């Protein structure tokens, strides 16, 4: 596939890919990205991605880990999260959906060195709960660990 960098998106045929999905496909050798008439190397494209998102690599590592395992991820900006994650085998669609077709988690990738206070943690958990999803923290270091958090009423 061939894509063309256009701001913070990559245009492929009649689709717009977010930078993170374009980088994933480039990383797998399934996409070539051009800016104007110049083919970008993986390193050049990564630099472009980092100009839009300084946390790109942290987000990408968690994204890649789940995509490689067969999960589908989408943006979760409207939920105040980085990504929404669909169970393996679920294809997101618009319109009326069964319970199984909704995303199961909202994902917040964080570096193992990052800290956040209880209020920030509670805020992330409330967002997940209010959207009927579970909170998934992706702890990124040399390896990626995922922690699933559920909201319980006493």
Swiss-Prot record:
Record: active site: 86, 102, 133
Enzyme's top EC category: lyase
Signal peptide: none
Domain of life: Archaea
Record-linked InterPro entries: tRNA_endonuc-like_dom_sf (IPR011856), tRNA_intron_Endo_cat-like_sf (IPR036167), tRNA_intron_Endonuc_cat-like (IPR006677), tRNA_intron_Endonuc_N (IPR006678), tRNA_intron_Endonuc_N_sf (IPR036740), tRNA_splic (IPR006676), tRNA_splic_arch_short (IPR016442)
Pfam families: tRNA_int_endo, tRNA_int_endo_N
Claim: Magnesium is one of the keywords in the record: no
Gene Ontology MF, one: tRNA-intron endonuclease activity
Transmembrane spans: none
GO biological process, one term: tRNA splicing, via endonucleolytic cleavage and ligation
UniProtKB keywords: Lyase, tRNA processing
CDD domains: tRNA-intron_lyase_C
EC number(s) on file: 4.6.1.16
GO cellular component: cytoplasm
Assembly behavior: Homotetramer; although the tetramer contains four active sites, only two participate in the cleavage. Therefore, it should be considered as a dimer of dimers.
HAMAP family (alphabetical): EndA_short (MF_01833)
Family according to the record: Belongs to the tRNA-intron endonuclease family. Archaeal short subfamily.
Protein's job: Endonuclease that removes tRNA introns. Cleaves pre-tRNA at the 5'- and 3'-splice sites to release the intron. The products are an intron and two tRNA half-molecules bearing 2',3' cyclic phosphate and 5'-OH termini. Recognizes a pseudosymmetric substrate in which 2 bulged loops of 3 bases are separated by a stem of 4 bp.
Protein name: tRNA-splicing endonuclease
Organism: Nanoarchaeum equitans (strain Kin4-M)
Gene that this sequence comes from: endA
